[in-house]
A protein has these predicted regions:
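Chalcogenol-based redox active-site neighborhoods
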Residues: 1-212
Length: 212
């Protein structure tokens, strides 16, 4: 299949998970979503990743974002592995894990990379907006665990810039100044950004984060 691109509608699917059968779009509802794959159950990096996500679920909820994991292992394997995650990561896994034994979802989302492995998924991440469109894609090799602080930062940026005519600069964090979109003329800035702004260059104008 063709590669999924930013702005594409995230493919819908039905799948078995550790929390029952879901229809993906229905499960998302009006929420944002993070779909992320891991190569295999009972592996070290994946164990730390899912433990971290479990601890971060409250932060995702603050952002109206649901998380769901996937690997090509079976349901019983997932359930047994969850016990290890809870024990070793001092957490309680509180989100569904898809059992994609037939690789249907992995194929749909192009998570199988033959140059890495044709049997296991790479570490893919898809951030999906409330409109069911793909907002972000990331792919990590099996050897490198993901940074979920960065994922939260990106969701903050995506949600902010979806509602205001701004963009977020390098290394931006929630609460810091943002840049005004180049399409906004100087004459409109006082009305749109009443907190004020700093004019650095005609194309580089900063303003305090508008929703803070």
């Amino acid at each position: 299949m063709s590669t999924l691109r930013l702005g594409d509608i995230a493919p819908d699917f039905q799948a078995e998970t550790t929390e029952g059968t879901i229809k993906f779009h229905e499960w998302l509802g009006d929420s944002w979503g993070v779909l992320f794959s891991h190569p295999a159950d009972f592996t070290p990096v994946c164990t730390t990743e899912l433990g971290t996500v479990a601890n971060y679920v409250p932060e995702f909820k603050k952002r109206n974002t649901k998380v769901i994991a996937l690997s090509v292992d079976g349901l019983e394997s997932h359930k047994e592995w969850i016990k290890d995650i809870n024990e070793t990561q001092n957490t309680t896994v509180n989100f569904p894990i898809i059992a994609d034994e037939d690789k249907k979802v992995a194929t749909l989302y192009d998570m199988l990379h033959p140059n890495a492995s044709d049997k296991f998924t790479v570490r893919s991440v898809f951030v999906i907006g409330a409109d069911k469109k793909i907002k972000l894609t990331l792919t990590y090799p099996a050897s490198t665990g993901r940074n979920f602080d960065e994922l939260l930062r990106v969701i903050d940026s995506l949600q902010l810039t979806a509602n205001y005519s701004v963009a977020t600069p390098a290394n931006w964090k929630d609460g810091e100044d943002v840049v005004i979109a180049p399409a906004i003329p100087d004459s409109d800035i006082p009305e749109k950004f009443p907190k004020g702004h700093t004019h650095i260059k005609p194309y580089l104008r900063t303003t305090p984060q508008p929703n803070k």
